[in-house]
């Protein structure tokens, strides 16, 4: 399941619901990654734009990989502004045992960092400045010559 949430994530609420689901399904593995906006240089926070249709397609591929491994994959990401100390990204992989859940967890997070259609901006003096040096070009993107 993919959730796009305006502003910072309420990780307590999300994790509570996901953990209850894991318990109801009698899963023994519950792997969590939470991205927290950290203080860096003179930023107030980060801001995110999302190409929703592409993100849904990208996530669906991972959802099917997870299902093939007997793992349930959950992801939530912020849209818009997220201040220092708040969470912008949460993913959970859960399954019967740790092996498949952990394997998927690492690969998913790395692929997310490089291929998810989410654009990051620094918030500096209440202005959004594209974080080009911390961004990765999407495969197949760019201008046609």
UniProtKB/Swiss-Prot annotation:
> Could you tell me which InterPro entries the record lists for this protein?
MoaE_sf, Mopterin_biosynth_MoaE
- Please give the name of this protein: Molybdopterin synthase catalytic subunit
Annotated source species: Helicobacter pylori (strain ATCC 700392 / 26695) (Campylobacter pylori)
* Keyword Transferase part of the UniProt annotation: yes
Q: What is its EC number?
A: 2.8.1.12
- Assembly state and interactors? Heterotetramer of 2 MoaD subunits and 2 MoaE subunits. Also stable as homodimer. The enzyme changes between these two forms during catalysis.
First-tier enzyme category under EC:
transferase
User: Which reaction equation describes what this protein catalyses?
Assistant: 2 [molybdopterin-synthase sulfur-carrier protein]-C-terminal-Gly-aminoethanethioate + cyclic pyranopterin phosphate + H2O = molybdopterin + 2 [molybdopterin-synthase sulfur-carrier protein]-C-terminal Gly-Gly + 2 H(+)
- Which terms in the Gene Ontology molecular function aspect does this entry carry? molybdopterin synthase activity
């Amino acid at each position: 399941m993919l959730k796009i949430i305006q502003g910072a994530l309420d990780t307590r609420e999300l994790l509570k619901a996901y953990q209850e689901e894991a318990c109801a399904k009698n899963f023994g593995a519950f792997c969590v990654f939470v991205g927290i906006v950290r203080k860096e240089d003179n930023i107030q926070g980060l801001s995110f734009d999302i190409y929703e249709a592409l993100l849904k397609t990208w996530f669906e591929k991972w959802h099917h990989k997870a299902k093939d491994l007997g793992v349930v994959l959950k992801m939530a990401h912020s849209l818009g502004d997220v201040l220092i100390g708040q969470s912008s990204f949460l993913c959970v992989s859960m399954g019967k045992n740790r092996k498949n859940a952990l394997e998927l967890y690492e690969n998913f997070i790395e692929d997310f960092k490089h291929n998810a259609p989410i654009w990051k901006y620094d918030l500096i003096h209440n202005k959004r400045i594209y974080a080009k040096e911390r961004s990765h070009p999407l495969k197949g993107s760019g201008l046609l010559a």
